[in-house]
Structure formats: C-alpha cells, structure tokens
Amino acid sequence: MRLAFVTSNPGKVEEARKYFEPLGVEVYQLKVSYPEIQADTLEEVAEYGAKWLAQRVDGPFFLDDSGLFVEALKGFPGVYSAYVYKTIGYQGILKLLQGEKNRKAHFKSVIAYWDGELHIFTGRVDGKIATEPRGSGGFGFDPIFIPEGFDRTFAEMTTEEKNRISHRGRALREFANWLKENLK
Ligand code: ITT
Ligand code: NA
C-alpha cells in the first residue's frame, strides 16, 4: 500500500516513512499547499484542510497539523506554532520563558486521513522546555523539547526513538491500527 502525505515538511515525512516502513506501507510526500484557517483547535485546522484538499486531490491522502503548547504561556504558540516558528523561532520561545520556573509543555499532533470520508487520529506527548537548545536531529521545536521521563531533547534522539514516544508517533500508531482493522 502507498499513502500520500500532504505536507511541506520533510521532517514529518521522514517520521511517517520510518513508522510505516516495517508495516509494509510506503509513504510519499504530496506537496500541495492548502489553507490553514485560524481556529481554536488543531482538529478544526486539520478538518478544514482535509475537506478542502478532498475537492482537489485524487485518491486517499492524509495530513498532519501539530502544535507546541507551553503551560506558562497559556498554551501559546499552540495553533500558531508554524507562524511562531517562522518568525521568532525556538529562540523566541526560550526568550519568552527566561527566568520562568514552570517549563511544562506538550506537543499535539492531529492526523486527518481522507478516503472519501474524514478520519481523525490524535497524539500527545508531555514534557518540558529546555533552558538551551540541544541536538541536531528532528526539526522545528525539537531542540528545546524534553519529553517526560528523558533528559534528552527530541533533537538528540533518532527518528525511531522519537516516534516511540512522540505526539506524531502516537497519532501514527492510532492511524496504523485503524488501517489494519479497516483495510481487511
Ligand atoms: P505542514 O506543511 O505539514 O503544515 P508545518 O511545518 O507548517 O508543515 P504544522 O503547521 O503542523 O507543520 O507545524 C507547526 C509548527 O510546529 C511547525 O513550525 C513545525 O516545525 C513545528 N512542529 C510540528 N511537529 C513538530 C515536531 O514533531 N517537533 C518539533 N516541531 C514540530
Ligand atoms: Na503548516
């Protein structure tokens, strides 16, 4: 089976590929841009994007909308994560948290799969924001996020390690389980 992943982010593709490879599913990147609406939740953003793409893309596809939610910043950047990453970057988040004791944060990932109907899969990982960036793996906010139970950032892990515990890994697991049940 081949699965089209609509995304502009090669880091996401790499993670989905590594996740699905052992299951005999090939993931390929489909670079079609779609509107990301301003909404309160990742689910709404993902659902709107998937329904918009459904009118324009042939065959099944999935997309992933993710965000980093920092407790001391009342959930910011959350649904604005892509914009914040492009503008102030992870250095900007570190600056906002300077001197802050509460470093708790979580990542959330929403996968929307369209096969004529919409299917939503989600995953979350709790952790904290590091005081300085570490590691060169991964992408995005990975150098400043330390998952609970670890003392390394996501950027200091291999893709396989990150997949085992990450928001996206968990959403991919739900997605893969659903495919197993529904493609018989
Ligand atoms: P799409 O084309 O798939 O939308 P994107 O990078 O814009 O790619 P999102 O809107 O979902 O993706 O991402 C929001 C931001 O959060 C973006 O800057 C990502 O780099 C970052 N991000 C998403 N998942 C991440 C992860 O697993 N680790 C670190 N940063 C992540
Ligand atoms: Na995006």
Curated annotation (Swiss-Prot):
Entry binding sites for Mg(2+): 36, 65
Organism from which the protein derives: Thermococcus kodakarensis (strain ATCC BAA-918 / JCM 12380 / KOD1) (Pyrococcus kodakaraensis (strain KOD1))
CDD domains noted in UniProt: HAM1 (cd00515)
InterPro entries: dITP/XTP_pyrophosphatase, ITPase-like_fam, RdgB/HAM1
Family: Belongs to the HAM1 NTPase family.
Record protein name field: dITP/XTP pyrophosphatase
Enzyme class, UniProt record, top EC level: hydrolase
Catalytically driven reaction(s): XTP + H2O = XMP + diphosphate + H(+); dITP + H2O = dIMP + diphosphate + H(+); ITP + H2O = IMP + diphosphate + H(+)
